[in-house]
């Protein structure tokens, strides 16, 4: 779980700094509205790991921390951009959760929540541009590079 969290945090930070991303939903980022709740809900062993991680991997102004392997984000644009991003990924596989340690990506509006009427999905914040990532335990740099190249492929023309 540590590797999932560390990788997910790196992916979330990469997405957050991208001009092609509208917003990132990851409780370990200070920008998340429930980041304090997420931190205080950690069990003692996870809290110990997070505090050690922050001590050795974060600057004083960076209050982020590894929190699960799930990252959601809204790509700028709509379904066309979201689908292009997903098909441009090389490491992340397009699939719903398979219970493994490999990185997966999905478009909830078309996959897990496809049976919900569009108007209801919008009320729930599940638009056509929402992408959900299950970040695996591959090399962090490889995952970050995959995100960056897929974003470039999507928006480069």
Residue ranges of each PLM-predicted region?
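Flexible, glycine/proline-enriched loop segments at strand-loop-helix junctions
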Residues: 1
């Amino acid at each position: 779980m540590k590797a999932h969290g560390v990788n997910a945090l790196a992916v979330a930070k990469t997405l957050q700094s991208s001009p092609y991303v509208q917003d990132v939903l990851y409780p370990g980022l200070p920008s998340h509205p429930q980041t304090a709740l997420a931190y205080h809900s950690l069990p003692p062993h996870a809290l110990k790991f997070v505090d050690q991680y922050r001590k050795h991997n974060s600057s004083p102004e960076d209050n982020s921390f590894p929190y699960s392997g799930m990252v959601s984000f809204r790509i700028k644009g709509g379904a066309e951009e979201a689908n292009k991003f997903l098909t441009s990924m090389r490491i992340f596989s397009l699939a719903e959760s398979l219970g493994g340690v490999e990185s997966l990506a999905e478009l909830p509006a078309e996959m897990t929540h496809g049976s919900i009427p569009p108007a209801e999905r919008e009320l729930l914040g599940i638009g056509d541009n929402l992408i959900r990532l299950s970040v695996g335990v591959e090399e962090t740099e490889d995952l970050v590079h995959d995100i960056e190249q897929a974003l470039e492929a999507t928006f480069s023309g």
